[in-house]
Swiss-Prot record:
PTM annotation (Cysteine methyl ester): residues: C215
Motif residue range(s): Effector region: 54-61
Gene name of this polypeptide: rabT2
The keyword Zinc belongs to this UniProt entry's keyword annotation: no
Superkingdom assignment: Eukaryota
Main location: membrane
Protein name per its UniProtKB record: Ras-related protein RabT2
Propeptide: 216-218
Molecular functions (GO terms): GTP binding; GTPase activity
InterPro entries assigned to the protein according to its UniProt record, in alphabetical order: P-loop_NTPase, Rab, Small_GTP-bd, Small_GTPase
Organism: Dictyostelium discoideum
Localization terms from the record: Cell membrane
Binding site for GTP: 32-39, 80-84, 140-143
Family per record: Belongs to the small GTPase superfamily. Rab family.
């Protein structure tokens, strides 16, 4: 059974830009145990909607405009890597080029909290820039107040022990605290100067050059 809910959104005005203008791309990877609600959190943040009973399969991502910071235009690419056991072996490629990570656990599931260390180890072992990675941790499903197993104080102490500066309990279902951890993560990444410059003009030129070479061979 599927239930769909929506909440009020706040619209941010994005400056008019040409499609060929350069921009800075920030790549964020969402990690956590299966059924912690990564897809639901991403859906709530990006589309402002919630659909009960929908699980992400494999890897999915969204790209959204962020805006201008210090004269540079930023776009955010957020990857939802499904971490069911059968997918863990294929996620290494998605760590490459990641500027930040959002780790999720289920507030009602102690094991998902215990496994946060596994996901931190994955970042250390698979991300080339792990020594300077930006990480936030969120506990999803805080709306299930009678079923919560992890005390927020315990979560905060864990974050402090790992030098992770941001922790937040959220609810994708009830749209509680969804935007704040994303904004904190993006701002910390930008402050560190971590992003990839994308030049659509250069990409287009390379594509055309490659096509011309192929035509000359024929």
């Amino acid at each position: 059974m599927k239930e769909k809910t929506t909440a009020t959104t706040t619209t941010t005005t994005i400056p008019t830009r040409n499609a060929d203008d350069d921009y800075e791309l920030i790549k964020v990877l969402m990690l956590g145990d299966y059924k912690t609600g990564k897809g639901s959190v991403l859906r709530r943040y990006h589309y402002n909607e919630f659909e009960l009973g929908v699980s992400s399969i494999g890897v999915d991502f969204v790209i959204r405009d962020y805006g201008i910071v210090n004269g540079k235009y930023y776009k955010i690419q957020i990857w939802d890597a499904n971490s069911c056991e059968r997918f863990r072996s294929i996620t290494q490629a998605y760590y490459r080029g990641a500027h930040g990570f959002m780790l999720l656990y289920d507030c009602t599931n102690q094991e998902s909290f215990n496994n946060l260390q596994f996901w931190i180890n994955e970042i250390i072992n698979k991300s080339p820039n792990s020594n300077n990675s930006t990480i936030v941790i969120i506990g999803n499903k805080c709306d299930l107040v009678n079923d919560i197993k992890i005390d927020p104080i315990k979560s905060k102490l864990f974050c402090d022990s790992k030098s992770i500066t941001s922790f937040q309990n959220v609810s994708a279902k009830d749209s509680i605290n969804i935007n704040e951890p994303f904004e904190i993560l993006f701002k910390q990444i930008i402050e560190k100067g971590h992003s990839q410059t994308i030049s659509p003009k250069l990409i287009k030129q390379r594509y055309e050059n490659n096509n011309n070479k192929s035509c000359n061979i024929l």
